[in-house]
Design a protein with these regions (language model features):
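Peripheral, non-AAA+ core regions of ATP-driven protein-machinery
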Residues: 1-215, 219-226, 326, 479-497
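Conserved catalytic network of the ASCE P-loop NTPase/AAA+ motor domain
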Residues: 26, 57-60, 97-99, 129-131, ...
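Residues immediately C-terminal
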Residues: 112, 298-299, 305-306, 392
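The Walker A (P-loop) glycine that initiates the GxxxxGKT/S ATP-binding motif of P-loop NTPases
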Residues: 218, 280, 302
Length: 497
């Protein structure tokens, strides 16, 4: 047989499109041609594969070899196709039975000795292989990650000779058995460690219950960062699909996806981060912080210290839950359904309104400082809370609400939302909002009058409605009442003061 086809997977964002590696041997002067839009690392695989085959004891065909990576319009990069190319050459030259490659996908980079090295982005490929009902061959170091795709048969190999012996029937391999030891609970910091700040804790409860974005404003040392770091522990546990989605993102980003499996991400980029670092980018697009925070929390401390153009790129993903990065050779889509928590000081020195009277900032300095945050960005933050200085006691607080107690209330509210509309309140579209956030006529007129008095936009009013819906869910009430609207409006009315 002079033609063989082996299936593999490319990496495009967090997707893994199928790539067919076609190997054809023809008569003529010995040569090896690789086509199908390969990048440098893929073109270099010709030399790696040749040395690996020879050092493993196989014959390298002295014929005219053509390798095609289809589809031709899909860019291919990295050494992930080495193993597929080697198996294709072996099958096309008759050193392996061609039928053994049916229903098989493989990933792996070859060393010159024939050893198989790990590659990144294995989990998205494993999920795609499972959907295609194929068996997956991966390097042994990637096997635990690939096994997260439940129902997929995985073969883990260290050397080219192992998979060749399996395909020839001389030394059959057993499917990899996942250890399952890396799914231990991750201890989140407890909310009870934060002393006082009842109003801020109430806002944190509302934010967790409805997946609302939150802005904490106050002097230094009042507990803004402590409060933000407690939010992931209040959120409901990830379900299997969400956990796999998060793990797939970290697999693509070269992070170990099992390190905190299956915990909600908490990302805290420095205020000097660039726009590509925040939303993703590069000649070969990689996920940024907003994608790494998918299904979790993105915490931006010292919000006005970020460059304004960096903050403005958050506006689209805050609405759509995804980010699209366009390049000359195509567009890459990354998920970005994160919960934004931001913290800021009220003025450049940080002590505006502090009882100590230490603030010496002029009104112009305060206005210029706050002017770094655009109105459209602030409108997309549902809850604006002032965190004021309280007790300075070094003794641990007693009687503080624990994370377990708050997370139980959050879980009950989220269950009501999922049963009613299939998503958290913050993610309601316009039609679903009108359907699930209906008001009595008197309450509707009251909210409209408040919006006119405070000069709120229609988007701000919609977000007030969603927060009010969350407040009603926390009380297990079906109808939104005036007091829910008043509290939701309070979080909005303190925005720009």
């Amino acid at each position: 047989m002079s033609l063989a086809i082996v299936h593999s997977r490319a990496q495009v964002g967090v997707e893994a499109p199928c790539v067919s590696v076609e190997a054809h041997l023809a008569n003529g002067l010995p040569s090896l041609t690789l086509v199908g839009l390969p990048e440098t690392a893929v073109r270099e695989s010709k030399d790696r594969v040749r040395s690996a085959l020879l050092n493993a004891g196989f014959d390298f065909p002295a014929r005219r070899i053509t390798l095609n990576l289809a589809p031709a319009d899909l860019p291919k990069d990295g050494g992930r196709f080495d193993l597929a190319i080697a198996l294709g050459i072996l099958a096309a030259s008759g050193q392996l039975p061609g039928t053994a490659l049916d229903g098989l996908e493989c990933l792996g980079e070859l060393a010159l000795s024939g050893a198989i090295r790990p590659v990144r982005g294995v989990l998205p490929a494993a999920l795609a292989a499972r959907d295609a009902r194929r068996v997956l061959v991966v390097p042994k170091e990637n096997a635990e990650e690939a096994s997260l795709a439940s129902g997929l048969t995985v073969f883990a190999v260290d050397h080219l000779l192992e998979i060749a012996g399996h395909l020839s029937g001389q030394a059959p391999l057993l499917p990899y058995q996942a250890r399952g030891l890396l799914r231990a609970p991750f201890p989140y910091p407890d909310l009870a460690e934060v002393q006082g700040q009842a109003a801020a804790k109430r806002a944190l409860l509302v934010a967790a219950a409805g997946a609302h974005n939150l802005l904490l404003s106050g002097p230094p040392g009042t507990g803004k960062t402590l409060l933000a770091s407690r939010l992931p522990g209040l959120l409901p546990a990830l379900d299997e699909d969400e956990a796999l989605e998060v793990a797939a993102i970290h697999s693509v980003a070269s992070h170990v996806p099992l390190r905190h499996w299956p915990q909600r991400p908490f990302r805290q980029p420095h205020h000097s981060a660039s726009a590509p670092a925040l939303v993703g980018g590069g000649s070969r697009p990689q996920p940024g912080e907003i994608t790494l925070a998918h299904q979790g929390v993105l915490f931006l401390d010292e919000l006005p210290e970020f460059e304004r153009k960096v903050l403005e790129v958050l506006r689209e993903p805050l609405e759509s839950g995804e980010i699209v990065i366009a390049r000359a050779n195509g567009r890459v889509r990354f998920p970005a359904r994160f919960q934004l928590v931001a913290a800021m000081n009220p003025c450049p020195c940080g002590y505006l309104g502090d009882p100590s009277g230490r603030c010496r900032c002029t009104p112009e300095q305060v206005q210029r400082y706050r002017g770094k945050l655009s109105g459209p960005l602030l409108e997309r933050i549902d809850l604006h809370v002032s965190v004021l200085r309280e007790s300075t006691s070094l003794q641990p607080g007693h009687g503080e609400t624990a994370t377990a107690e708050v997370s139980e209330r959050v879980g009950a509210a989220r269950q009501r939302q999922l049963a009613r509309q299939g998503c958290a309140n913050a993610h309601l579209d316009l039609q679903a909002m009108h359907r699930n956030c209906a008001l009595a006529e008197a309450d509707r007129r009251w909210l409209e009058a408040a919006g006119e008095r405070l000069e709120l936009s229609l988007r701000a009013l919609h977000r007030i409605l969603k927060v009010a819906r969350t407040l009603a869910d926390l009380e297990r009430i079906d109808a939104i009442e005036r007091r829910h609207l008043a509290e939701a409006l309070q979080y909005r009315a303190t925005t720009s003061t």
